[in-house]
């Protein structure tokens, strides 16, 4: 099992490039199910979840080509033949986004069998909002042997109100609705950039969608969709993670190939904390910090508020602020699993329910820590970058689910970080980073 060895203390200086958004790419790959034609997606990140989605689609009979190169990360998907509309447990057990094939499958084939999804263990992300919406559209749902089976001759348009804002639920039902008979209205819909990115692809495929990016989305169903070419949005969470990496290390970092418009809440909090951020053109940000950080409270919200996927990283930064920072998690319960690992590194953090109190400025010391989920893992990387000594991060496959070659990107801007695989016990490997 791979590990990271990180020696802290180096300011990050230089330019780091942001990859395509995993959380945009996954629903866009699922959208290829809706047509017999080829769908070409560009700016696909090279991360573990994308490979899992490829396996999922090919297990259904699709043809999926993934190509990675310096200039272009691209996938070509053909779902002309879907021989088995089943999302098998052995594939989807590691990825929550597998639920996104439910809507497209029942819309295109009239049948979907999807195992209850897996992914990060950060609280309840109920699929019941997907199910309720599909039932309103006329689908018959059966739960059997750990699978959700949905059937419908053709889905019917419906007015669907989400009791709770759900990104994957909005995406799943938007995909289901594009081939439904009549108009579907999604109320209290998610407004995230990943939703608008999916809507842009679906529109390019011939769908009729209005209001994506607002709380009410209207979809007029069509008989058939065609193929399209689409470029995936930059990953706003990866970009935000690098902004904090520059700030926490007291560096001077340019974060390129991002979309500053998608980072408003993150930028605002960092600037309040005393971090200097400059917009360089339409797709780059420069972050500078001299290490004097103010304690600024944060409360996670749905977009355009402060993203829950940046909460753990912000908490790592808060350990270096001069005072007490309150962090409130409003989206998911049980999303403080990184706290105990940060405490192992010397952080002074106390939790009560959904609120964490972070007292700084705390000198962090290197430790062996466990990566529990994707964003918690990112927070540990950030903490290790400023910790005194050499930290060892175990189970970094959680990082690989959503960050493309993060160790190579960080090493390129001055971090002392090395990936160790099964040869971890070889002292010569560990010594390489100690001597660098």
From Swiss-Prot:
The keyword Transferase applies. The active site is at residue 120. It holds the Pfam family EPSP_synthase. This is UDP-N-acetylglucosamine 1-carboxyvinyltransferase. It is an enzyme of class 2 (transferase). The modification 2-(S-cysteinyl)pyruvic acid O-phosphothioketal is found at residue 120. Keywords: Cell cycle, Cell division, Cell shape, Cell wall biogenesis/degradation, Cytoplasm, Peptidoglycan synthesis, Pyruvate, Transferase. It catalyses: phosphoenolpyruvate + UDP-N-acetyl-alpha-D-glucosamine = UDP-N-acetyl-3-O-(1-carboxyvinyl)-alpha-D-glucosamine + phosphate. It comes from Acidobacterium capsulatum (strain ATCC 51196 / DSM 11244 / BCRC 80197 / JCM 7670 / NBRC 15755 / NCIMB 13165 / 161). Belongs to the EPSP synthase family. MurA subfamily.
